[in-house]
């Protein structure tokens, strides 16, 4: 084997390479037909896909808990949510391999996190912060390459929310402050 540590260093790439090698072997006429080469290759590929799905699930949990913490800052569960953010993010970071970056479905991760947070907040009679952007405002690097600064992540999420018309009453849009005239 050319790179004996690839299995340990990057299971996703290893699985893809092994599946391709098995398919190439399976196409050789001189080899026995007793081995179901295509399905063996598919099973090995599924190892890599499973690892990707695990990281996606952990990222969904990380983001969902961030959204809950942001949307319901006074909820009794806020301390628990903060612990969960740290736990899920660390687990995602430990399992993440660089080859996964292009395979992670970032749009689905963000959408699933928003849906999961919304469902959970309803149980507490809370609602999601309105105006969240369609794309995740937290970069993959922020989520996967270092220990997450939870307060910074919460500020970034809050700053990315686009105020809705009902929220605009708390903002002043006039360039000049209004002055009162007295008679």
Annotate each language-model stretch with its function.
Residues 1-60, 64-183:
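Surface/interface-facing alpha-helical segments and adjacent flexible terminal/loop regions used
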